[in-house]
Each structure stands twice: as structure tokens, then as C-alpha cells.
């Protein structure tokens, strides 16, 4: 294994120290470790908090700043952040209007964020939750019960962050997050595995003519391992799966801060249909050249046009990664005029930065 690290035990500490030094708009907190906006808490605005195991950079710490997250909690590589990190970060960023926890649907994340939610409620913080489960590839896997939360998380953090920035209430921000989760669909493929530094070897092996179709962002298995032939055929198979697996009925939990209890709510993901307008994200899972991602986007635009989908905005690059995995994911999120206005609103974070 050749990686730009000193010691596998220091990877998280050193990368977070570098992030904070590169971006004075962020503050790195210690004991426990978490990252916040330098100006947090911001009075009069809902605070957004997310987190996960490290290895997915720039998610989530790279999305802290004006118009997006107020704070983020990084765990060790592919390991959920502990409840004390989440609790302390939320206490630090709460400006009095409440804290919204954005949680990707992985068993460890759910357990730890739910524990922190109850601790925050007991401490007098107005808090609620949104669970993200956009991966259409599999239901139930190594890390999850139900579908996995992947790159649509980035789009939701941007859009709900813009709503919080303009002064929307905690309930309105949470409702928007749940709506966007039901309108977003993602799928990924891998041509090569990632290497977790502590393991020192690739998490799986593929033959030269194979791909892992529907791979997870921790290297989890997908739908199947199938032959790899060409860019166009790969994008076609992914696009068809996004459309075919769009409809999804399940029950998700959220915290009702008024009742002080967990509530279960049946929800339905909406399949994409001709006439829909979308934000398209072509996401590098770690080691795929940008030139190849643009080739993917070229084919994706053709397939969207054929299906009657209008791409209103796009992102192409590394936004939700899996260390050094060779591969990519596609996310399509249904939008309307209001959603696009939130997307175009100013955002100033290390990884997304536009507007005044």
C-alpha cells in the first residue's frame, strides 16, 4: 500500500488539521472532534448538522459554511461518529431556532444520531431529523436496513441549507429535506476497489473486464458483478436502473420535538417521469479522471433527453467519495422553480462556492 499518510492512526487528525488551516472560515474542535462554521452559532437561523465516517471527502466537512451546513461530525474512516461528537457539535451551533440532523441511512449512523437526538432533547435543544436513502441499487446490505444514503445527501444539504439561510423554520427545513429525499435517486458502479489505510489492501478484487454494479460508498456489494464493456453501455444500464427502481415505499422515523418522541411515517419515493426537471450529479467515487466523468455526463444528457427529462443544473466532480475507489455514481433529483432558486442561492463552503 502506497498512500500519502504518516501513520494509519493519524489519518483523520492530520486531514482535519489541514482542512482547518486551509479554510479559516471553519473551526476544528477537539475532545470530542467535530468541525463548525467559525461564526457559529448564527442567531435567528436553523442550524444544519450532518456527519459520517471519514473517507467520503469532501462530504461532510467540506460542506460547512454559509448556505449549507453549520457543523459536521467526522468519524474514523468508514466508522460512524459517536453520539458525544454529535451532541457537542449541535450544542455549539444551535442559534436558538433549532438543529436539523441530516442522517444517511446506515445502521451505525442511525443509532448514534438517534442517541444524540434524545440527549439534545433532554438538554432543551429543539431538534429534528431527516433520513436520506437515495441509493436504488439494493434494499438491505452490509451497513443498512433499507436503501443506503449516498450522493443525494450533498444536494439536500445545499438546498435545505439555503432554506435555513433565508430564515425558514425548523419544521419547514425538515419538511423540505424529506420531500427532496423522496425525489432523489442514485446509483454507483466500481471498476476498482478502495483501500482502507488500516486494512492495507483493496476491499475487493475485480477482473479487468468486470464492474461492481450498484456498489456502496464503503465498497459494499451492489446488485451484481457484471461484465464491463463501454462507457455508453454502463451509463445506459445505470440510467435504466434509476428509472425502473424509482418507486419505493417504506416507513422512516423522525424525532418530534413537540411530543418528545420518535414518530414513524410511511413515505413513497417518486419515480422519475417524462416532463420532470432534474439536477444531475455525476460523482467521482475517488479515482476516476475528470475527463471520463465528462464522457459519462455526455451520455447521461442523451439518455435524459430521450426519456423526456430536462437537466436544469449539474455537478460533475468528486462530491461523495469512497477513498480511492475507481468508479462513479449518478444522482438525479427532481426539482421545480422554488428548488432551483434554493440551488442558485449563494453558498460559501470549501467544496461548493458560488454567489455573493
Where would I find each of the regions flagged by the language model?
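Short glycine-rich or small-residue beta-strand-to-loop segments that form or flank ligand, phosphate
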Residues: 2, 46-53, 69-72, 98-107, ...
Amino acid at each position: 500500500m502506497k498512500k500519502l499518510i504518516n501513520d494509519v492512526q493519524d489519518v483523520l487528525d492530520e486531514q482535519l488539521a489541514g482542512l482547518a488551516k486551509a479554510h479559516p472560515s471553519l473551526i476544528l474542535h477537539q475532545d470530542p472532534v467535530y468541525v463548525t462554521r467559525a461564526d457559529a452559532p448564527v442567531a435567528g437561523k436553523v442550524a444544519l448538522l450532518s456527519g459520517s465516517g471519514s473517507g467520503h471527502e469532501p462530504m461532510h466537512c467540506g460542506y460547512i459554511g454559509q448556505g449549507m451546513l453549520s457543523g459536521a461530525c467526522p468519524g474514523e474512516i468508514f466508522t460512524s461518529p459517536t453520539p458525544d461528537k454529535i451532541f457537542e457539535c449541535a450544542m455549539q451551533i444551535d442559534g436558538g431556532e433549532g438543529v436539523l440532523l441530516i442522517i444517511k441511512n446506515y445502521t451505525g449512523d442511525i443509532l448514534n444520531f438517534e442517541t444524540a437526538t434524545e440527549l439534545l432533547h433532554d438538554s432543551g435543544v429543539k431538534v429534528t431529523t431527516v433520513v436520506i436513502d437515495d441509493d436504488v441499487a439494493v434494499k438491505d446490505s452490509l451497513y443498512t436496513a433499507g436503501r443506503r444514503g449516498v450522493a443525494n445527501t450533498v444536494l439536500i444539504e445545499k438546498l435545505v441549507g439555503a432554506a435555513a439561510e433565508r430564515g425558514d423554520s425548523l419544521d419547514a427545513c425538515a419538511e423540505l429535506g424529506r420531500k427532496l429525499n423522496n425525489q432523489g435517486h442514485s446509483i454507483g458502479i466500481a471498476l476498482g476497489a478502495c483501500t482502507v489505510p488500516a486494512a492495507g489492501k483493496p476491499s475487493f478484487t475485480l477482473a479487468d473486464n468486470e464492474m461492481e454494479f450498484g456498489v456502496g460508498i464503503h465498497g459494499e456489494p451492489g446488485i451484481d458483478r457484471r461484465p464491463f464493456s463501454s462507457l455508453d453501455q454502463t451509463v445506459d444500464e445505470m440510467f435504466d436502473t434509476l428509472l425502473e427502481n424509482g418507486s419505493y415505499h417504506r416507513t422512516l422515523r423522525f424525532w418530534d420535538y413537540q411530543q418528545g418522541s420518535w414518530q414513524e411515517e410511511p413515505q413513497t419515493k417518486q419515480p422519475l417521469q417524462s416532463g420532470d426537471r432534474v439536477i444531475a450529479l455525476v460523482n467521482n467515487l475517488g479515482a476516476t479522471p475528470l475527463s471520463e466523468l465528462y464522457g459519462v455526463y455526455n451520455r447521461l444528457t442523451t439518455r435524459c433527453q430521450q426519456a423526456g427529462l430536462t437537466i436544469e443544473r449539474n455537478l460533475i466532480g468528486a462530491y461523495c467519495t469512497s477513498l480511492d475507489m475507481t468508479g462513479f455514481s449518478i444522482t438525479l433529483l427532481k426539482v421545480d422553480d422554488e428548488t432551483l432558486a434554493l440551488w442558485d442561492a449563494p453558498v460559501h463552503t470549501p467544496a461548493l462556492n458560488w454567489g455573493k
